[in-house]
Amino acid sequence: MSTPTLQTGHVGLNVTDLARSIAFYRQVFDFEVVREQTTGDRRYALLGREGTLMVTLWQQSGGAFATDRPGLHHLSFQVPDVEAVHRAEKVLRELGATLVYDGVVPHGEGASSGGVFFTDPDGIRLEIYAPSGAGAAPAPTQGAPTCGFF
């Protein structure tokens, strides 16, 4: 019996303020709103690109994302090149987003892959990275992937 090929579908995130989160994810990731319900008790938004659903936002939580609890560690998005990472970094700085490290950093010592690490308005840890082009700067963590310890 062969195992069918799997790929990640969409990722669902709980948020505290749907309108704020929709604006953030649209500006940072250039997502389109595929469908949304912004009134009533069941508020949500389905976000994607070119008809492909990528992230769902559910307004059904309070407080901030708890990084010390089991669950999502971080959500990562790959872009084609490091120039796209720098463009995202510029948008993040314009929005006043919290950057975990100063600018684009490699995933590890000697790695050419790397990106920008940041949090959304609810403290959910996010990453935008390129598979190459980030190797000139020193890695911010030693002996482990940068993306694992932020």
Enumerate the language-model features and the residues they cover.
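Short, solvent-exposed loop/turn elements at beta->coil junctions and helix N-caps
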Residues: 43, 62-63, 103-108
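Short coil/turn motifs at secondary-structure junctions
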Residues: 62, 80, 131-133
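Vicinal oxygen chelate
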Residues: 2-4, 7-17, 45, 66-150
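Residue-level structural signal for beta-strand termini and adjacent loop
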Residues: 39, 59-60, 105, 131
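Core segments of cupin and vicinal oxygen chelate
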Residues: 13-55, 59
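Short beta-strand/turn micro-motifs at beta-sheet edges
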Residues: 1, 60-65
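Alpha-helical elements of the RecA-like P-loop NTPase motor core of helicases
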Residues: 22-23, 86, 126
